[in-house]
């Protein structure tokens, strides 16, 4: 009997194809597999929001097909307090947070992990993320998924070294086409199910309509870089740096006649600042500061390091030099200027395929 046969793994099941195939792959590797479906948002399930009744039904179908037991748990309270409230607080002060990263940090790899290990007596947990855990030379590394188009390491940079050693990512060595083919051969109900996109608690609703229920709309003015009023906005929280659409100032003709873009948000005066041209100097950054820096590797950074950084999901890696500051903060010097780096977003650092960690962007330096 192999070592894997005595290992119990709880798979986070979402009702999607990736977690479905993850469960089957682990079965093939000899693990004792059980599933767990998390409900993270209280809402009317008939409105097709995340954690809906249909997702749970699909998960039950997959588990029945694979012959594994399914646990269910409600983490809505934990999600509200540790993810959604933080999301609202950040937006209310003009920053643009990433709720998926918060959810992974606070729910999937904290409450789910603790519940699986302590209450369900599991040895490990697994998720359907497209990343790889590699054990080599008595060390464990978080590596990008083989499918670079689906790689999700950006969302998992908050994993601690200890947490990483308690996790498995079965589909990280496959591409999406292979995953769907496996699901089709197994006749899983999730085989052709579309990938979830966007912010889960918003679903198909318009972002502004949803957020305005929690953050009061405070109309204000849009000004140019000289302080001239050129339009009106519906609340600085609803705009992001580099945004072009929805400003309704296209008819304002100045300078070079190029389109207008949001280049800054003055939250204290409830003012939006816009300038013309996608490559305006106020939109281009050559350096920034990160706070709340977290490392997947065992030790924090103590000396400058040359690596690459990703400032948003699906954005290309940029060569950079990172310098440790006090309180585990970093200064990041970019090799080339980058467009619309946004406070509140995460900067994630890599050495080739290896994800080192990351932090929250708090201050940017323009060209």
UniProtKB/Swiss-Prot annotation:
Classification via InterPro entries: MnmA-like, MnmA-like_C, MnmA-like_central, MnmA-like_central_sf, Rossmann-like_a/b/a_fold
Disulfide bonds listed in the record: 103-200
Site feature: Interaction with tRNA: 129, 345
Protein EC: 2.8.1.13
GO CC, alphabetical: cytoplasm
Record's subcellular location: Cytoplasm
Annotated residues for binding of ATP: 12-19, 38, 128
SUPFAM superfamilies named among the record's database cross-references: Adenine nucleotide alpha hydrolases-like
Segments of this protein annotated with the region Interaction with target base in tRNA: 98-100
Interaction with tRNA: region residues: 150-152, 312-313
Keywords: ATP-binding, Cytoplasm, Disulfide bond, Nucleotide-binding, RNA-binding, Transferase, tRNA processing, tRNA-binding
Family: Belongs to the MnmA/TRMU family.
Function summary: Catalyzes the 2-thiolation of uridine at the wobble position (U34) of tRNA(Lys), tRNA(Glu) and tRNA(Gln), leading to the formation of s(2)U34, the first step of tRNA-mnm(5)s(2)U34 synthesis. Sulfur is provided by IscS, via a sulfur-relay system. Binds ATP and its substrate tRNAs.
Complex and partners: Interacts with TusE.
Listed name of the protein: tRNA-specific 2-thiouridylase MnmA
